[in-house]
Amino acid sequence: RPAPFLIHQESNVIVRAFRDYLRQDIGEILIDNPKVLELARQHIAALGRPDFSSKIKLYTGEIPLFSHYQIESQIESAFQREVRLPSGGSIVIDSTEALTAIDINSARATRGGDIEETAFNTNLEAADEIARQLRLRDLGGLIVIDFIDMTPVRHQRAVENRLREAVRQDRARIQISHISRFGLLEMSRQRLSPSLGESSHHVCPRCSGTGTVRDNESLSLSILRLIEEEALKENTQEVHAIVPVPIASYLLNEKRSAVNAIETRQDGVRCVIVPNDQMETPHYHVLRVRKGEETPTLSYMLPKL
């Protein structure tokens, strides 16, 4: 056959859903589109599962299907770093290159008459929610869970068993260790596909994925040192610092004397601070202009990088 031609095509979302999630304990399958309903019944027939045919039903309610069953809120929770628990506690999920860390906080949890009982109940709730979030986010690899400290060993074993029971319906292979003396539980989950974060998020262009940026004062001082380094080089005529507006304000006001001192020490070197309203911290650009190079006389005519 002449190239190019199709070698393989992944099944559509209906086929994949039935293939991956069809289980005997499913009570009904609701579909809000008649055409999709017919395709689903055809696929069930092709699978030789007539027992599921009667479970496939057309949803005709006026409220959208996902809103009626509060699925939208569950989907949104999969995109949140913090997930609330029924008792008022929460779990915080952070993924790194090496592992996924999950921290349980009692926060406003008030159930129970003492701290130990509150910790135990919150950890039980967290075990159920963690199992659900692992499936929703399709998190794989090494996962470390920091449970709230519990003194009785029986409580630790109960939380471990609750987690094992909660992940039974997960189609990925899962291994779970015991809670250590530091309150940490390590587990691994088979990576079936890219996680929700990998497939639907991109790295923040401002912080480059770190989650934090340097404050204005710290960054300004760093840029000031870099300006001085460039000014010290031989044959330097000018040093241009193209920076965000807050950084320019700090350098031109709080550090005006320091900029003037650099120009005084390096006789003949001109330091030019150019505010760029399109630039955000921590981004900046310091440019050294050698003697003899042509540059615009006016700073506002400098290119905005």
Regions found by a protein language model. Give the residues of each.
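DE-rich acidic low-complexity regions and acidic surface loops
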Residues: 1-305
